[in-house]
Amino acid sequence: WKWWPTLYKNLKHFRMTGGEPMMDVNTYKVFQYIIDHPKDDLHLNVTSNMCPPDEKLKAKYFNMAQEICMQEKVEHMMQFVSVDAFGKRAEYIRDGLDFNYMMDNVEEFLDRIPSRNSITFICTYNNLSITSMDKLLEKILELRKRYSKTYQRVWFDVPLLRQPAWQQITMLPESYQAIHEDNIKYMQDNSGEHNGLHIFKDFEIQKMQRNLAYWRENADASTQNKKNFYAFF
């Protein structure tokens, strides 16, 4: 912490990842420092599962985030939320995740803190994501329609999982590509210039298309990957 005040003076972007920042005392030290030393050009980013085991922790986190945003202590706060599928399938991927509780917390965050922040769902796209991605996309669109009024408050990203190899999308049977294609079609059907905050953007569609292209070019349903998939799942 000795170097923090010196660094902070010229800091433009600061991101806290996991573990779980809600459970780290240093998160609240950073928040308090920002509250005490407002910086109107700072972009504050935090990655969380949004599923804290203790309601007191959640209350502390939300209260401090609310003060930071509503009292304009920073330029913007981006709350990244790690979720790789929808519902029970997301819970299977991330041990300890309560999907409904997580989504309730996302909506509470957006309701309680209506300015200077956004949510980004980070879906590490893997072979367990494919079959419920449609429902996650539908939920994202629903949240955009509800919360994005003057600027986009609900984002998402689909970076490909590369390791372990047996969890990559590339080891799935070719027939699963049709599911991915249907998801791209759904996004295309809900794109365009009209009502620009409540649609899927071209660059978001392109990310899904790139994932599909990578899948087709690198398909590898090797016996060893199948054995590992079976052993772990």
Language-model regions, residue ranges each:
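C-terminal accessory regions of radical SAM enzymes
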Residues: 142-233
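A short acidic, amphipathic alpha-helical/loop segment
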Residues: 3, 26-33, 60, 64, ...
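Residue-level detector of alpha-helical secondary structure
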Residues: 35, 62, 103, 107-110, ...
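A structural motif corresponding to the C-terminal end of an alpha-helix
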Residues: 3-10, 68-75, 105-119, 143, ...
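Catalytic cores of alpha/beta
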Residues: 127-143
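Alpha-helical repeat scaffolds in large eukaryotic proteins
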Residues: 32-35, 66, 107-110, 138-141
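Core AdoMet radical
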Residues: 8-25, 37-104, 117-127, 150-167
